[in-house]
Amino acid sequence: MRLCVALDMASKDENLALVRELKGLDLWLKVGLRSYLRDGAKFIEELKGAGEFKIFLDLKLYDIPNTMADAAEVVSKIGVDMINLHASAGERAMKTVMERLNALQNRPLVLAVSALTSFSESEFEAVYNDTLSRSVRKFSQMSFEAGLDGMVCSVFESKLIKEVTNQNFITLCPGVRPFGESAGDQKRVANLVSAKQEDSDFIVVGRPIYENENPREICERILEQI
């Protein structure tokens, strides 16, 4: 299991200060929509220069097939190691993206978002008119058939996803509160024990790290346990 630190702080300077503090640790960095819109591709370059970190660009692409493929190609060429898109864009859109990216010399890992971890079961059903578990199963199979590398999902969906695809299909799980911290705006949260039991490949941790007085110490504690 790998640790991915969410760079969701209020400014680029704060994010870079955190990254410098974590230099030398074996982890990934997640750049979300706010940080990317505010700080741009140059921020990715700065992160690459701050240490030997791999970068997950979390933009959750969602559009018509060719537009998604165009966008995926652009972000792939700035040197990130993982990107994502919404599975609900459909299998044709996902296949179009993968056909485009497989033509590149070095493409990033591509994951599909099943259901945002901010959704409760009832909220998900109100939007998608289906149960969460049935939709996750369907989205996972579609993504696997389209040639993607894995899914962004809650810890509690990780085993199900691997059962309907295969054990090498990556699961990246946000909403992890390593030591029982506040859930914040997440609904489907889990701790480290659950993440390990459910065979999660990546866990994403943000606030419990950057809101702590000693972010490096927390990261080291997490890395020791995973």
Swiss-Prot record:
Database matches in InterPro entries: Aldolase_TIM, OMPdecase, OMPdecase_AS, OMPdecase_bac, OMPdeCOase_dom, RibuloseP-bd_barrel
Record-level GO cellular component terms: cytosol
Keyword Lyase: yes
Disulfide bonds: none
Pfam families membership: OMPdecase
One of the GO BP terms on file: 'de novo' pyrimidine nucleobase biosynthetic process
EC number: 4.1.1.23
Keyword DNA damage in annotation: no
UniProtKB keywords: Decarboxylase, Lyase, Pyrimidine biosynthesis
Signal peptide: none
Cross-referenced HAMAP family: OMPdecase_type1_B
Entry's family note: Belongs to the OMP decarboxylase family. Type 1 subfamily.
Task of the protein: Catalyzes the decarboxylation of orotidine 5'-monophosphate (OMP) to uridine 5'-monophosphate (UMP).
Assembly behavior: Homodimer.
Protein name, as recorded: Orotidine 5'-phosphate decarboxylase
Organism: Campylobacter concisus (strain 13826)
